[in-house]
């Protein structure tokens, strides 16, 4: 096991409150620490993860409250379509280079399972942040599932669904216009110029319908739909909670 800076990670034998000071004389501490228990995972978000092998325990350490652990947490709430229920997840969204978090091996996408040996799977974003921020030494139990990528794909899925809905509405409008023009063409027996004009219009509509039926994946009118799935630590739509620690 690699050895690291004493102020980056130490063993999980103890955790400190805001009134404690890390031991500056500690040497050759281990990066990974033995978890004292396995914490239950959320079935919806943790499918495919081997619970026992995936969980890893780290102990982060800083000298003062003015210094940073070097990572940022972000919380989302995902909606389970099968049961129409909401499930929260808090994960590491950013890790500063050469920070205590970086030297400990914390990775963007790590999910926070427990803080100081207390499960936080159902805790709010504010509760998790408070439990970490009040410590000079904090033990974390993490599971990696690249949540950042999952969120990006979820955003893209939302965007594509809105684009598809917009194209379907456009298609229906064009089909209705085509039907009206076709009816007008069938009923009227005007001069050849009018007939040619109608035929030209119908041809243009056919071309538009082909384009609608094969839409390219691009942003609809420059609209950004990401906010639709960025929700806070409760269950309502709003601004995502991001906190640097």
Swiss-Prot record:
It is a peripheral membrane protein. It is found in: Cell membrane; Nucleus; Cytoplasm, Perinuclear region. Hermaphrodite and male germlines. Residues 8-17 have a biased composition (Low complexity). The modification Phosphoserine is found at residue 233. Disruption phenotype: Normal brood size, with a slight increase in embryonic and larval lethality. Higher number of male progeny. Increase in germ cell apoptosis. Keywords: Cell membrane, Cytoplasm, Meiosis, Membrane, Nucleus, Phosphoprotein. GO terms for cellular component: nucleus; perinuclear region of cytoplasm; plasma membrane. Residues 57-132 form the PDZ domain. SMART domains: PDZ. Residues 233-236 are annotated as: C-terminal Ser/Thr cluster. GO terms for biological process: meiotic cell cycle. Phosphorylation at a C-terminal Ser/Thr cluster is required for limiting autosome, but not X chromosome, movement in early prophase I. Plays a role in early meiotic events; during prophase I contributes to normal meiotic progression, timely homologous chromosome pairing, synaptonemal complex assembly and meiotic DNA double-strand breaks repair. Effects on homologous chromosome pairing and synapsis are alpha-importin-independent. Limits early prophase I chromosome movement in a dhc-1/dynein-dependent manner. Shares partial functional conservation with human CYTIP in meiotic DNA double-strand break (DSB) repair. Interacts with syp-3. This is General receptor for phosphoinositides 1-associated scaffold protein 1 homolog. It comes from Caenorhabditis elegans. The lineage of its organism: Eukaryota, Metazoa, Ecdysozoa, Nematoda, Chromadorea. The gene is gras-1.
């Amino acid at each position: 096991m690699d050895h690291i800076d004493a102020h980056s990670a130490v063993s999980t034998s103890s955790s400190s409150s805001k009134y404690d000071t890390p031991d500056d004389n500690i040497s050759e501490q281990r990066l990974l620490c033995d978890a004292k228990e396995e914490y239950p995972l959320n079935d919806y978000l943790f499918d495919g993860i081997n619970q026992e092998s995936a969980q890893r325990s780290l102990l982060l350490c800083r000298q003062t409250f003015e210094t940073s652990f070097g990572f940022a947490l972000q919380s989302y709430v995902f909606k389970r379509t099968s049961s129409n229920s909401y499930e929260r997840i808090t994960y590491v969204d950013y890790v500063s280079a050469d920070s205590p978090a970086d030297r400990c091996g914390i990775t963007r996408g790590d999910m926070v399972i427990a803080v100081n040996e207390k499960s936080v799977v159902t805790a709010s974003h504010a509760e998790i942040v408070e439990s970490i921020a009040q410590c000079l030494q904090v033990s974390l139990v993490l599971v990696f599932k690249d949540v950042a990528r999952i969120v990006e794909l979820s955003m893209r899925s939302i965007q594509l669904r809105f684009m598809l809905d917009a194209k379907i509405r456009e298609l229906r409008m064009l089909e209705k216009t085509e039907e009206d023009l076709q009816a007008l063409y069938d009923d009227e027996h005007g001069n050849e110029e009018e007939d040619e004009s109608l035929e030209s219009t119908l041809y243009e509509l056919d071309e538009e319908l082909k384009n609608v039926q094969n839409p390219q994946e691009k942003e609809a009118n420059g609209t950004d739909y990401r906010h639709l799935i960025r929700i806070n630590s409760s269950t309502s739509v709003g601004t995502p909670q991001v906190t640097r620690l």
